[in-house]
Amino acid sequence: MSEVKHIQKLFADLYDGVPWTEVKLTTILTDITSEQAAKKIIPEANSIWQLVQHCVGWRDNVLRKLQGDVFHSPKDNYLTQPDNVSPQAWQHLLSHLEQSEKNWERFLEQLDDNKLHAPYLPSKGKFTIYEVIHGILHHDNYHFGQIVMLKKLL
């Protein structure tokens, strides 16, 4: 199996498969309401909503940069608590997450193993494409763990 195929499997498993952590995102978020997602369970911490929004923002950000877009991340790092916390807005965010997963799947389907060790241009050569893609997986896992903990406190 090629390295890109392994990466595709890691993305798919983390989202809705059988990840080694035994925690997949779709299961974590399934029964969380918009009210629960927006709740600041720990006042100094991010809400579940903010964490999902942050993950989606970074997934989109890195993918766009891998595809050649040039832009800057927002100063809030995609962590602003939303004004609209309606069920429709929550569903919209979850749909955006699902679309992000599909966008990564499409990107990875077209990626060749030979390109994995090319420099990730926005990092000015400090990181490879391989490292940045794995970084997104680690980033998601880290924040999904936070979501699991916050969900237990609901």
Protein language model annotation of sequence segments:
Residues 2-4, 8-22, 26-29, 34-80, ...:
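Short, contiguous alpha-helical
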Residues 84-117, 134-136:
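Acidic/histidine-rich alpha-helical segments that form the ligand environment
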